[in-house]
Protein backbone atom coordinates (compact mmCIF):
# COMPACT_ATOMS: atom_id res chain seq x y z
CA UNK A 1 0.00 0.00 0.00
CA UNK A 2 1.27 3.48 -0.89
CA UNK A 3 2.27 5.70 2.03
CA UNK A 4 -0.22 8.59 2.17
CA UNK A 5 1.88 10.77 4.49
CA UNK A 6 3.79 12.66 1.79
CA UNK A 7 0.62 12.95 -0.29
CA UNK A 8 -1.36 14.47 2.58
CA UNK A 9 1.50 16.81 3.45
CA UNK A 10 1.66 18.02 -0.13
CA UNK A 11 -2.12 18.50 -0.15
CA UNK A 12 -2.00 20.59 3.05
CA UNK A 13 0.81 22.77 1.71
CA UNK A 14 -1.02 23.27 -1.57
CA UNK A 15 -4.28 24.08 0.24
CA UNK A 16 -2.52 26.64 2.46
CA UNK A 17 -0.83 28.27 -0.53
CA UNK A 18 -4.09 28.53 -2.44
CA UNK A 19 -5.90 29.96 0.61
CA UNK A 20 -3.16 32.52 1.25
CA UNK A 21 -3.24 33.67 -2.36
CA UNK A 22 -7.02 34.05 -2.33
CA UNK A 23 -7.04 35.92 1.00
CA UNK A 24 -4.32 38.20 -0.28
CA UNK A 25 -6.33 39.04 -3.36
CA UNK A 26 -9.52 39.62 -1.38
CA UNK A 27 -8.27 41.40 1.75
CA UNK A 28 -5.13 43.31 0.85
CA UNK A 29 -6.94 46.00 -1.18
CA UNK A 30 -9.29 46.55 1.77
CA UNK A 31 -6.35 46.95 4.14
CA UNK A 32 -4.71 49.49 1.85
CA UNK A 33 -7.95 51.42 1.64
CA UNK A 34 -8.36 51.39 5.43
CA UNK A 35 -4.83 52.64 5.90
CA UNK A 36 -5.40 55.46 3.44
CA UNK A 37 -8.62 56.45 5.19
CA UNK A 38 -6.88 56.47 8.58
CA UNK A 39 -4.24 58.97 7.48
CA UNK A 40 -6.88 61.08 5.74
CA UNK A 41 -9.01 61.29 8.89
CA UNK A 42 -6.01 62.22 11.02
CA UNK A 43 -5.20 65.13 8.70
CA UNK A 44 -8.82 66.17 8.75
CA UNK A 45 -8.83 66.24 12.57
CA UNK A 46 -5.65 68.31 12.68
CA UNK A 47 -7.19 70.85 10.27
CA UNK A 48 -10.44 70.90 12.21
CA UNK A 49 -8.68 71.39 15.53
CA UNK A 50 -5.59 73.48 14.76
CA UNK A 51 -4.75 73.84 18.44
CA UNK A 52 -4.17 70.06 18.58
CA UNK A 53 -0.83 69.12 17.20
CA UNK A 54 0.43 65.79 15.84
CA UNK A 55 1.94 64.77 19.18
CA UNK A 56 -1.27 65.46 21.08
CA UNK A 57 -3.33 63.42 18.63
CA UNK A 58 -0.94 60.45 18.89
CA UNK A 59 -1.21 60.52 22.69
CA UNK A 60 -5.00 60.48 22.49
CA UNK A 61 -4.97 57.53 20.10
CA UNK A 62 -2.56 55.62 22.34
CA UNK A 63 -4.82 56.06 25.35
CA UNK A 64 -7.85 54.94 23.39
CA UNK A 65 -6.05 51.85 22.07
CA UNK A 66 -4.89 50.86 25.54
CA UNK A 67 -8.40 51.23 26.95
CA UNK A 68 -9.84 49.10 24.19
CA UNK A 69 -7.24 46.45 24.93
CA UNK A 70 -8.34 46.35 28.57
CA UNK A 71 -11.92 45.69 27.57
CA UNK A 72 -13.24 49.14 28.21
CA UNK A 73 -15.82 50.61 25.85
CA UNK A 74 -14.22 53.57 24.07
CA UNK A 75 -17.41 54.93 22.53
CA UNK A 76 -20.45 56.33 24.25
CA UNK A 77 -20.95 57.25 27.86
CA UNK A 78 -21.78 53.75 29.07
CA UNK A 79 -19.16 51.14 30.01
CA UNK A 80 -19.61 47.37 29.70
CA UNK A 81 -18.46 45.09 32.53
CA UNK A 82 -16.91 42.02 30.95
CA UNK A 83 -16.15 40.38 34.30
CA UNK A 84 -19.53 40.24 35.97
CA UNK A 85 -20.90 36.75 36.56
CA UNK A 86 -22.95 36.35 33.31
CA UNK A 87 -20.13 37.65 31.11
CA UNK A 88 -17.51 35.64 33.06
CA UNK A 89 -19.69 32.59 32.40
CA UNK A 90 -19.44 33.23 28.66
CA UNK A 91 -15.67 33.66 28.96
CA UNK A 92 -15.33 30.36 30.87
CA UNK A 93 -17.34 28.65 28.13
CA UNK A 94 -15.02 30.02 25.48
CA UNK A 95 -12.05 28.62 27.45
CA UNK A 96 -13.21 25.03 27.93
CA UNK A 97 -14.70 24.80 24.43
CA UNK A 98 -11.38 26.04 22.96
CA UNK A 99 -13.21 28.78 21.02
CA UNK A 100 -11.22 31.65 22.53
CA UNK A 101 -12.68 34.74 20.94
CA UNK A 102 -9.93 36.97 22.24
CA UNK A 103 -12.04 40.05 22.81
CA UNK A 104 -11.80 39.41 26.55
CA UNK A 105 -8.74 37.96 28.24
CA UNK A 106 -7.24 37.92 31.75
CA UNK A 107 -4.95 40.87 32.45
CA UNK A 108 -3.60 40.02 35.90
CA UNK A 109 -0.85 37.42 36.52
CA UNK A 110 -3.07 35.48 38.93
CA UNK A 111 -5.94 35.40 36.43
CA UNK A 112 -3.67 34.17 33.63
CA UNK A 113 -2.18 31.42 35.83
CA UNK A 114 -5.65 30.27 36.89
CA UNK A 115 -6.77 30.27 33.24
CA UNK A 116 -3.96 27.83 32.41
CA UNK A 117 -4.99 25.24 35.02
CA UNK A 118 -8.69 25.84 34.40
CA UNK A 119 -8.32 25.04 30.73
CA UNK A 120 -5.98 22.11 31.46
CA UNK A 121 -8.71 20.24 33.32
CA UNK A 122 -11.77 21.83 31.71
CA UNK A 123 -10.98 21.15 28.05
CA UNK A 124 -10.88 17.30 28.36
CA UNK A 125 -13.99 17.35 30.54
CA UNK A 126 -15.91 19.48 28.06
CA UNK A 127 -14.82 17.39 25.07
CA UNK A 128 -15.92 14.20 26.86
CA UNK A 129 -19.32 15.69 27.65
CA UNK A 130 -19.75 16.95 24.09
CA UNK A 131 -18.90 13.48 22.76
CA UNK A 132 -21.49 11.90 25.05
CA UNK A 133 -24.02 14.48 23.92
CA UNK A 134 -23.28 13.64 20.31
CA UNK A 135 -23.79 9.93 21.02
CA UNK A 136 -27.13 10.79 22.60
CA UNK A 137 -28.28 12.46 19.41
CA UNK A 138 -26.84 9.56 17.44
CA UNK A 139 -28.97 7.18 19.50
CA UNK A 140 -32.05 9.22 18.67
CA UNK A 141 -31.18 8.97 14.98
CA UNK A 142 -30.71 5.20 15.34
CA UNK A 143 -34.12 4.84 16.95
CA UNK A 144 -35.60 6.82 14.11
CA UNK A 145 -34.03 4.39 11.67
CA UNK A 146 -35.43 1.40 13.57
CA UNK A 147 -38.85 3.02 13.57
CA UNK A 148 -38.69 3.49 9.82
CA UNK A 149 -37.61 -0.12 9.22
CA UNK A 150 -40.50 -1.37 11.35
CA UNK A 151 -42.82 0.67 9.17
CA UNK A 152 -41.66 -1.31 6.15
CA UNK A 153 -38.98 1.06 4.86
CA UNK A 154 -35.90 -0.68 3.50
CA UNK A 155 -32.69 -0.47 5.46
CA UNK A 156 -30.88 1.57 2.85
CA UNK A 157 -33.72 4.09 2.58
CA UNK A 158 -33.87 4.36 6.37
CA UNK A 159 -30.14 5.07 6.53
CA UNK A 160 -30.40 7.72 3.84
CA UNK A 161 -33.37 9.32 5.60
CA UNK A 162 -31.59 9.48 8.97
CA UNK A 163 -28.48 10.92 7.38
CA UNK A 164 -30.43 13.60 5.54
CA UNK A 165 -32.36 14.55 8.68
CA UNK A 166 -29.15 14.73 10.71
CA UNK A 167 -27.38 16.98 8.21
CA UNK A 168 -30.38 19.22 7.55
CA UNK A 169 -31.11 19.59 11.26
CA UNK A 170 -27.54 20.61 12.03
CA UNK A 171 -27.26 23.04 9.14
CA UNK A 172 -30.60 24.67 9.86
CA UNK A 173 -30.26 24.95 13.63
CA UNK A 174 -26.60 25.95 13.79
CA UNK A 175 -25.86 27.80 10.56
CA UNK A 176 -28.97 29.01 8.72
CA UNK A 177 -31.43 30.15 11.42
CA UNK A 178 -29.06 31.83 13.97
CA UNK A 179 -27.97 34.65 11.61
CA UNK A 180 -31.57 35.88 11.53
CA UNK A 181 -31.58 36.06 15.33
CA UNK A 182 -28.26 37.94 15.33
CA UNK A 183 -29.59 40.39 12.77
CA UNK A 184 -32.29 41.37 15.26
CA UNK A 185 -30.30 41.32 18.50
CA UNK A 186 -26.81 42.38 17.39
CA UNK A 187 -27.57 44.52 14.38
CA UNK A 188 -25.42 42.44 11.99
CA UNK A 189 -26.28 41.56 8.45
CA UNK A 190 -26.89 37.97 7.39
CA UNK A 191 -23.34 37.38 6.12
CA UNK A 192 -21.85 38.60 9.38
CA UNK A 193 -24.22 36.39 11.37
CA UNK A 194 -23.43 33.35 9.20
CA UNK A 195 -19.74 34.10 9.52
CA UNK A 196 -19.99 34.34 13.30
CA UNK A 197 -22.00 31.12 13.51
CA UNK A 198 -19.47 29.11 11.56
CA UNK A 199 -16.44 30.62 13.34
CA UNK A 200 -18.02 29.78 16.69
CA UNK A 201 -19.24 26.23 15.92
CA UNK A 202 -15.92 25.29 14.32
CA UNK A 203 -14.10 26.64 17.45
CA UNK A 204 -11.97 28.98 15.32
CA UNK A 205 -13.09 32.01 17.33
CA UNK A 206 -11.43 35.07 15.83
CA UNK A 207 -13.22 37.39 18.22
CA UNK A 208 -14.00 40.14 15.75
CA UNK A 209 -17.71 39.33 16.18
CA UNK A 210 -18.96 38.25 19.57
CA UNK A 211 -22.59 37.91 20.54
CA UNK A 212 -23.88 39.52 23.73
CA UNK A 213 -21.04 42.00 24.35
CA UNK A 214 -22.32 45.15 22.65
CA UNK A 215 -22.59 47.78 25.38
CA UNK A 216 -25.11 49.86 23.46
CA UNK A 217 -27.47 46.91 22.87
CA UNK A 218 -30.36 46.07 25.20
CA UNK A 219 -30.24 42.24 25.56
CA UNK A 220 -32.82 39.93 27.05
CA UNK A 221 -31.93 38.38 30.38
CA UNK A 222 -31.79 34.84 28.89
CA UNK A 223 -30.12 35.83 25.64
CA UNK A 224 -26.55 35.10 26.76
CA UNK A 225 -27.57 31.68 28.17
CA UNK A 226 -29.33 30.91 24.92
CA UNK A 227 -26.12 31.71 23.01
CA UNK A 228 -24.11 29.49 25.36
CA UNK A 229 -26.51 26.54 24.98
CA UNK A 230 -26.51 27.02 21.23
CA UNK A 231 -22.69 26.80 21.26
CA UNK A 232 -22.73 23.50 23.21
CA UNK A 233 -25.34 21.91 20.95
CA UNK A 234 -23.43 23.05 17.89
CA UNK A 235 -20.22 21.48 19.19
CA UNK A 236 -22.06 18.20 19.92
CA UNK A 237 -23.50 18.17 16.40
CA UNK A 238 -20.07 18.87 14.96
CA UNK A 239 -18.57 16.01 17.00
CA UNK A 240 -21.26 13.62 15.77
CA UNK A 241 -20.78 14.83 12.23
CA UNK A 242 -17.01 14.19 12.42
CA UNK A 243 -17.58 10.71 13.84
CA UNK A 244 -20.08 9.98 11.09
CA UNK A 245 -17.60 11.12 8.46
CA UNK A 246 -14.87 8.94 9.97
CA UNK A 247 -17.14 5.89 10.13
CA UNK A 248 -18.24 6.54 6.57
CA UNK A 249 -14.62 6.61 5.41
CA UNK A 250 -13.94 3.40 7.35
CA UNK A 251 -16.90 1.66 5.74
CA UNK A 252 -15.83 2.84 2.31
CA UNK A 253 -12.31 1.54 2.96
CA UNK A 254 -13.70 -1.84 4.06
CA UNK A 255 -15.88 -2.01 0.97
CA UNK A 256 -12.90 -1.26 -1.26
CA UNK A 257 -10.81 -3.95 0.44
CA UNK A 258 -13.66 -6.44 0.15
CA UNK A 259 -14.04 -5.67 -3.55
CA UNK A 260 -10.31 -6.11 -4.08
CA UNK A 261 -10.39 -9.43 -2.25
CA UNK A 262 -13.27 -10.68 -4.37
CA UNK A 263 -11.54 -9.54 -7.52
CA UNK A 264 -8.37 -11.34 -6.45
CA UNK A 265 -10.25 -14.55 -5.65
CA UNK A 266 -12.05 -14.47 -8.98
CA UNK A 267 -8.76 -13.87 -10.74
CA UNK A 268 -7.09 -16.80 -8.98
CA UNK A 269 -10.02 -19.11 -9.70
CA UNK A 270 -9.87 -18.49 -13.45
CA UNK A 271 -7.73 -20.95 -15.53
CA UNK A 272 -5.78 -18.17 -17.22
CA UNK A 273 -4.68 -16.78 -13.87
CA UNK A 274 -3.59 -20.23 -12.67
CA UNK A 275 -1.47 -20.66 -15.76
CA UNK A 276 0.07 -17.23 -15.21
CA UNK A 277 0.82 -18.07 -11.59
CA UNK A 278 2.46 -21.35 -12.61
CA UNK A 279 4.66 -19.53 -15.11
CA UNK A 280 5.52 -16.97 -12.47
CA UNK A 281 6.37 -19.71 -9.98
CA UNK A 282 8.62 -21.47 -12.50
CA UNK A 283 10.52 -18.26 -13.17
CA UNK A 284 10.75 -17.45 -9.50
CA UNK A 285 12.17 -20.90 -8.74
CA UNK A 286 15.32 -19.97 -10.62
CA UNK A 287 16.10 -17.23 -8.12
CA UNK A 288 18.59 -18.09 -5.42
CA UNK A 289 17.42 -17.67 -1.88
CA UNK A 290 20.60 -16.73 -0.11
CA UNK A 291 19.17 -17.38 3.36
CA UNK A 292 18.19 -20.96 2.57
CA UNK A 293 21.50 -21.43 0.78
CA UNK A 294 23.49 -20.28 3.80
CA UNK A 295 21.43 -22.42 6.17
CA UNK A 296 21.85 -25.54 4.03
CA UNK A 297 23.35 -28.40 6.01
CA UNK A 298 26.71 -29.61 4.84
CA UNK A 299 26.78 -33.25 3.77
CA UNK A 300 28.98 -35.48 5.88
CA UNK A 301 30.38 -38.97 5.34
CA UNK A 302 27.40 -40.50 7.15
CA UNK A 303 24.99 -38.73 4.79
CA UNK A 304 26.86 -40.13 1.78
CA UNK A 305 26.70 -43.65 3.23
CA UNK A 306 22.95 -43.25 3.78
CA UNK A 307 22.51 -42.11 0.21
CA UNK A 308 24.43 -45.15 -1.04
CA UNK A 309 22.22 -47.39 1.08
CA UNK A 310 19.05 -45.80 -0.28
CA UNK A 311 20.29 -46.18 -3.84
CA UNK A 312 21.08 -49.86 -3.18
CA UNK A 313 17.59 -50.36 -1.76
CA UNK A 314 15.99 -48.71 -4.80
CA UNK A 315 18.03 -50.75 -7.28
CA UNK A 316 17.19 -53.99 -5.44
CA UNK A 317 13.51 -53.51 -6.27
CA UNK A 318 12.23 -52.54 -2.82
CA UNK A 319 10.31 -55.80 -2.20
CA UNK A 320 12.92 -58.47 -2.98
CA UNK A 321 14.48 -60.40 -0.16
CA UNK A 322 17.44 -61.64 -2.16
CA UNK A 323 20.74 -59.89 -2.32
CA UNK A 324 20.99 -56.84 -4.48
CA UNK A 325 23.83 -55.38 -6.46
CA UNK A 326 25.94 -54.32 -3.49
CA UNK A 327 29.61 -53.96 -3.12
CA UNK A 328 30.18 -57.38 -1.51
CA UNK A 329 30.71 -60.71 -3.19
CA UNK A 330 26.99 -61.23 -3.66
CA UNK A 331 26.73 -58.05 -5.66
CA UNK A 332 29.59 -58.70 -8.00
CA UNK A 333 32.19 -56.90 -5.90
CA UNK A 334 35.36 -58.12 -4.31
CA UNK A 335 35.24 -61.83 -3.24
CA UNK A 336 35.34 -62.56 0.46
CA UNK A 337 38.02 -64.83 1.89
CA UNK A 338 36.91 -68.22 3.17
CA UNK A 339 36.99 -68.73 6.93
CA UNK A 340 40.06 -71.00 6.67
CA UNK A 341 42.10 -68.27 4.98
CA UNK A 342 41.01 -65.38 7.20
CA UNK A 343 44.30 -63.99 8.57
CA UNK A 344 45.07 -63.78 12.24
CA UNK A 345 46.48 -60.42 13.29
CA UNK A 346 49.11 -60.73 15.99
CA UNK A 347 51.12 -57.73 17.05
CA UNK A 348 54.28 -58.31 19.05
CA UNK A 349 56.60 -55.45 19.82
CA UNK A 350 59.63 -56.97 21.56
CA UNK A 351 58.55 -60.53 22.25
CA UNK A 352 60.36 -63.27 20.24
CA UNK A 353 58.18 -66.29 19.35
CA UNK A 354 59.40 -69.70 20.41
CA UNK A 355 59.95 -72.76 18.24
CA UNK A 356 56.70 -74.33 19.41
CA UNK A 357 54.69 -71.26 18.39
CA UNK A 358 56.34 -71.25 14.95
CA UNK A 359 55.66 -74.95 14.48
CA UNK A 360 52.05 -74.57 15.55
CA UNK A 361 51.53 -71.68 13.13
CA UNK A 362 53.08 -73.59 10.22
CA UNK A 363 51.06 -76.69 11.02
CA UNK A 364 47.83 -74.68 11.12
CA UNK A 365 48.59 -73.38 7.62
CA UNK A 366 49.40 -76.83 6.25
CA UNK A 367 53.14 -76.37 5.77
CA UNK A 368 54.00 -79.12 8.28
CA UNK A 369 52.16 -82.39 8.62
CA UNK A 370 50.67 -83.31 12.00
CA UNK A 371 50.69 -86.57 13.83
CA UNK A 372 47.38 -88.33 14.45
CA UNK A 373 47.50 -87.43 18.14
CA UNK A 374 48.11 -83.80 17.44
CA UNK A 375 45.28 -83.72 14.89
CA UNK A 376 42.91 -85.26 17.45
CA UNK A 377 43.96 -82.75 20.09
CA UNK A 378 43.63 -79.86 17.63
CA UNK A 379 40.27 -81.12 16.40
CA UNK A 380 38.77 -81.48 19.89
CA UNK A 381 38.51 -77.78 20.84
CA UNK A 382 37.32 -76.92 17.37
CA UNK A 383 34.35 -79.25 17.73
CA UNK A 384 33.47 -77.87 21.16
CA UNK A 385 34.00 -74.22 20.19
CA UNK A 386 31.04 -72.29 18.79
CA UNK A 387 30.76 -71.75 15.08
CA UNK A 388 32.71 -68.78 13.86
CA UNK A 389 30.74 -65.66 13.11
CA UNK A 390 30.33 -64.80 9.45
CA UNK A 391 30.71 -61.08 8.91
CA UNK A 392 29.01 -59.45 5.96
CA UNK A 393 29.49 -56.12 4.31
CA UNK A 394 27.09 -53.54 5.67
CA UNK A 395 26.06 -52.36 2.21
CA UNK A 396 25.26 -55.99 1.20
CA UNK A 397 23.09 -56.31 4.28
CA UNK A 398 21.24 -53.15 3.22
CA UNK A 399 20.49 -54.56 -0.21
CA UNK A 400 19.29 -57.86 1.31
CA UNK A 401 17.14 -56.45 4.11
CA UNK A 402 16.03 -53.35 2.14
CA UNK A 403 16.40 -51.05 5.12
CA UNK A 404 18.47 -47.86 5.47
CA UNK A 405 21.83 -48.06 7.14
CA UNK A 406 22.33 -45.95 10.23
CA UNK A 407 25.96 -44.93 10.28
CA UNK A 408 25.87 -44.43 14.04
CA UNK A 409 25.16 -48.16 14.62
CA UNK A 410 28.03 -49.28 12.39
CA UNK A 411 30.89 -51.12 14.09
CA UNK A 412 34.16 -52.04 12.39
CA UNK A 413 34.78 -55.68 11.50
CA UNK A 414 37.10 -57.47 13.91
CA UNK A 415 38.41 -60.83 12.75
CA UNK A 416 39.26 -63.11 15.62
CA UNK A 417 40.82 -65.85 13.46
CA UNK A 418 43.41 -63.88 11.50
CA UNK A 419 46.89 -64.99 10.59
CA UNK A 420 48.62 -61.70 9.75
CA UNK A 421 51.67 -61.23 11.95
CA UNK A 422 53.00 -57.75 12.60
CA UNK A 423 56.57 -57.86 13.80
CA UNK A 424 57.92 -54.57 15.07
CA UNK A 425 61.35 -53.61 13.76
CA UNK A 426 63.96 -51.84 15.80
CA UNK A 427 66.47 -51.58 12.98
CA UNK A 428 63.98 -49.65 10.80
CA UNK A 429 64.08 -51.65 7.54
CA UNK A 430 61.41 -50.59 5.04
CA UNK A 431 58.91 -52.93 3.34
CA UNK A 432 60.56 -52.49 -0.03
CA UNK A 433 64.01 -53.53 1.23
CA UNK A 434 62.51 -56.49 3.05
CA UNK A 435 60.69 -57.72 -0.04
CA UNK A 436 63.86 -57.39 -2.13
CA UNK A 437 65.94 -59.27 0.44
CA UNK A 438 63.31 -62.01 0.63
CA UNK A 439 63.38 -62.42 -3.15
CA UNK A 440 67.20 -62.62 -3.21
CA UNK A 441 67.17 -65.13 -0.37
CA UNK A 442 64.67 -67.36 -2.18
CA UNK A 443 66.83 -67.37 -5.30
CA UNK A 444 69.95 -68.05 -3.28
CA UNK A 445 68.22 -70.90 -1.43
CA UNK A 446 67.31 -72.67 -4.67
CA UNK A 447 70.89 -72.43 -6.02
CA UNK A 448 72.71 -73.62 -2.89
CA UNK A 449 70.52 -75.93 -0.80
CA UNK A 450 73.57 -77.38 0.86
CA UNK A 451 74.57 -74.02 2.27
CA UNK A 452 71.10 -73.67 3.65
CA UNK A 453 71.32 -77.11 5.29
CA UNK A 454 74.56 -76.17 6.99
CA UNK A 455 73.01 -72.98 8.28
CA UNK A 456 70.10 -74.95 9.74
CA UNK A 457 72.32 -76.71 12.32
CA UNK A 458 73.26 -73.68 14.45
CA UNK A 459 69.72 -72.26 14.29
CA UNK A 460 68.27 -71.44 17.61
CA UNK A 461 64.51 -71.82 17.20
CA UNK A 462 63.83 -69.98 20.39
CA UNK A 463 64.88 -66.66 18.85
CA UNK A 464 63.22 -64.60 16.15
CA UNK A 465 64.71 -61.53 14.55
CA UNK A 466 63.51 -58.23 15.88
CA UNK A 467 64.59 -56.45 12.70
CA UNK A 468 62.26 -58.21 10.30
CA UNK A 469 59.70 -56.48 8.09
CA UNK A 470 57.11 -54.31 9.80
CA UNK A 471 54.17 -55.88 7.93
CA UNK A 472 53.83 -59.44 6.69
CA UNK A 473 50.75 -60.72 4.87
CA UNK A 474 50.27 -64.39 4.16
CA UNK A 475 48.89 -65.22 0.73
CA UNK A 476 48.11 -68.41 -1.13
CA UNK A 477 51.55 -68.45 -2.80
CA UNK A 478 53.26 -68.51 0.62
CA UNK A 479 51.13 -71.39 1.81
CA UNK A 480 52.86 -73.72 -0.68
CA UNK A 481 56.42 -73.00 0.55
CA UNK A 482 57.90 -76.01 2.39
CA UNK A 483 59.15 -75.83 5.93
CA UNK A 484 62.83 -76.36 5.04
CA UNK A 485 62.82 -73.50 2.55
CA UNK A 486 61.32 -71.14 5.13
CA UNK A 487 64.05 -72.06 7.61
CA UNK A 488 66.72 -71.52 4.94
CA UNK A 489 65.32 -68.06 4.24
CA UNK A 490 65.36 -67.32 7.92
CA UNK A 491 69.01 -68.42 8.33
CA UNK A 492 70.03 -66.50 5.24
CA UNK A 493 68.46 -63.32 6.58
CA UNK A 494 70.13 -63.67 10.01
CA UNK A 495 73.60 -64.70 8.80
CA UNK A 496 76.22 -61.94 8.40
CA UNK A 497 76.70 -60.74 4.85
CA UNK A 498 80.43 -61.38 4.93
CA UNK A 499 80.09 -65.10 5.70
UniProtKB/Swiss-Prot annotation:
Quote the catalytic activity from the record: K(+)(in) = K(+)(out)
> Which intervals of the chain are annotated as region Selectivity filter 2?
203-208
Instruction: Determine the domain of life of the protein's source.
Output: Eukaryota
Intramembrane stretches: 85-112, 190-215
Q: Mark the transmembrane ranges.
A: 8-26, 113-133, 158-180, 230-250
Q: Which residues bind K(+) 2?
A: 99-100, 204-205
Per UniProt, the keywords (alphabetical) are: Disulfide bond, Glycoprotein, Ion channel, Ion transport, Membrane, Metal-binding, Phosphoprotein, Potassium, Potassium channel, Potassium transport, Transmembrane, Transmembrane helix, Transport, Voltage-gated channel
Recount how this protein's activity depends on pH.
The homodimer is gated open at pH > 6. The heterodimer with KCNK16 or KCNK17 is gated open at physiological pH range 7-8 and increases current conductance at alkaline pH without apparent saturation.
Renumbered residue ranges of the record's region Disordered = 312-335, 360-388, 428-499
* InterPro entries on file: 2pore_dom_K_chnl (IPR003280), 2pore_dom_K_chnl_TASK (IPR003092), K_chnl_dom (IPR013099)
Q: Where is the composition biased (Gly residues)?
A: 316-334
Composition-biased stretches (Low complexity): 466-480
Binding-site list for K(+) 3:
100-101, 205-206
Regulation (activators, inhibitors):
The channel conductance is stimulated by extracellular alkaline pH. Inhibited by quinine, quinidine and external acidification.
As for what it does, the entry says: K(+) channel that conducts voltage-dependent outward rectifying currents upon membrane depolarization. Voltage sensing is coupled to K(+) electrochemical gradient in an 'ion flux gating' mode where outward but not inward ion flow opens the gate. Homo- and heterodimerizes to form functional channels with distinct regulatory and gating properties.
Q: Which family does it belong to?
A: Belongs to the two pore domain potassium channel (TC 1.A.1.8) family.
Task: Quote the protein name from its UniProt record.
Answer: Potassium channel subfamily K member 5
- What lineage is on file? Eukaryota, Metazoa, Chordata, Craniata, Vertebrata
Amino acid sequence: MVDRGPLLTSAIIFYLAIGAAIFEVLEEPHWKEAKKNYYTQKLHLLKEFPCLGQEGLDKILEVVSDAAGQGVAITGNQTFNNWNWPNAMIFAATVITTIGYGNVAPKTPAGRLFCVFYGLFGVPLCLTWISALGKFFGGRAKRLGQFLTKRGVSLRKAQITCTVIFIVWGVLVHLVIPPFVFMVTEGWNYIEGLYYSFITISTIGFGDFVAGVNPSANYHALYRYFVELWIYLGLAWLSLFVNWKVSMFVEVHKAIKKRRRRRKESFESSPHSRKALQVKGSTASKDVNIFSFLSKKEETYNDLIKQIGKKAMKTSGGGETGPGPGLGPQGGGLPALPPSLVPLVVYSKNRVPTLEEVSQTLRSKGHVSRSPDEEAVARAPEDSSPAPEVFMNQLDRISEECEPWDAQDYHPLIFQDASITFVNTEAGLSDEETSKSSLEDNLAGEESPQQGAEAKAPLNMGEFPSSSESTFTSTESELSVPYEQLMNEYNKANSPKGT
